[in-house]
């Protein structure tokens, strides 16, 4: 038993280090995907909106600019940073099971689920650290440089502390959903389209169907966003903490289904290879 646990821990450790190596480098997705999409984009939009709002508040007496509170200060970080990390993790999982990389993984990781765990750990920790740093940075910058509009933003308030804790938790859950969905779908483009389509189209458009607002209570990304403390018109009956727990539960379920799907595909591929080998022997 101890030997088995040590072997599993070793595989997960190697897989996590491999993912960190894979995501870094001069031409990696870190520089061309994560930094622009998960860091620069939300910062640029947040500061751009803040600059315009502060300008109007300073020069115009005919236009009233509403002050922004803490609970609405990191919306773009939640919207872009969390989702970009989930998409990158999903793409990494989908591509890891295909082509030469997939062939190598079948030999290096006989327990196929350890590869998924490694990716959830690697990208989940990265998403948590990145989102926490951006949340802290944004809530520190806004009231300091844009006081007319963002004076009410307080990183030390209950809402600010919740953001610092809950946004990284939501990011980890979103990465788990992405990895699980990628393992189920098994195709990079299909996974990315499905993930973005669900998060940005279905979860919002479902309110237009009969009983749509009831169905919307069960949307994982909306629950996760609400669970961070972000102001939303969407208000599930189980409250913010319940929304975050629900999002985490969906992530665990999808991840488990993804592990089962990867194991099943590996078994089918192995069966076809053994069958093909027997046929070649008979032909000889």
What is the predicted role of each segment?
Residues 2-6, 246-284:
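Junction motif at the cytosolic side of a transmembrane helix
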Residues 3-9, 27-92, 116-186, 201-204, ...:
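Secretory targeting signals
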Residues 9-27:
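A short amphipathic helical element positioned immediately N-terminal to and/or at the very start
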Residues 33, 103, 116, 192-193:
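Hydrophobic/aromatic positions within or immediately flanking transmembrane alpha-helices
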Residues 42-46, 188-222:
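Transmembrane helix segments
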Residues 50-55, 97, 101, 141, ...:
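Membrane-interfacial segments
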Residues 86-108:
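Transmembrane helix boundary and interhelical loop/hinge segments in multi-pass membrane proteins
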Residues 109-122, 194:
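Amphipathic cytosolic juxtamembrane alpha-helices at the membrane-cytosol interface
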């Amino acid at each position: 038993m101890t030997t088995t646990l040590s072997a599993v821990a070793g595989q997960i450790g190697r897989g996590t280090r491999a993912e960190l190596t894979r995501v870094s480098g001069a031409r990696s997705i870190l520089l061309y995907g994560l930094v622009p999409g998960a860091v620069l984009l939300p910062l640029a939009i947040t500061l751009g909106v803040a600059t315009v709002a502060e300008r109007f508040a300073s020069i115009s007496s005919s236009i009233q600019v509403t002050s922004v509170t803490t609970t609405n200060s990191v919306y773009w970080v939640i919207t872009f940073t969390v989702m970009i990390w989930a998409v990158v993790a999903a793409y990494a999982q989908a591509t890891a099971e295909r082509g030469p990389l997939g062939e190598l993984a079948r030999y290096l990781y006989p327990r196929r689920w350890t590869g998924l765990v490694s990716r959830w750990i690697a990208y989940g920790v990265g998403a948590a650290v990145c989102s926490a740093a951006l949340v802290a940075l944004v809530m520190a910058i806004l009231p300091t440089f844009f006081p007319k509009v963002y004076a009410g933003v307080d990183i030390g308030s209950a809402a600010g502390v919740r953001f610092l804790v809950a946004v990284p938790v939501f990011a980890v859950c979103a990465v788990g959903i992405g990895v699980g969905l990628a393992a189920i779908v098994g195709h990079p483009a299909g996974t990315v389209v499905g993930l973005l389509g669900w998060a940005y189209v279905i979860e919002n458009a479902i309110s237009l169907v009969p009983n749509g607002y009831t169905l919307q209570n069960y949307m994982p990304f909306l629950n996760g966003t609400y669970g961070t403390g972000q102001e939303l018109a969407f208000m599930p009956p189980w409250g913010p903490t319940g929304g975050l727990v629900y999002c985490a539960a969906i992530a665990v379920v999808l991840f488990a289904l993804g592990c089962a799907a990867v194991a099943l595909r590996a078994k089918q591929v192995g069966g076809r290879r053994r069958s093909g080998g027997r046929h070649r022997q008979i032909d000889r």
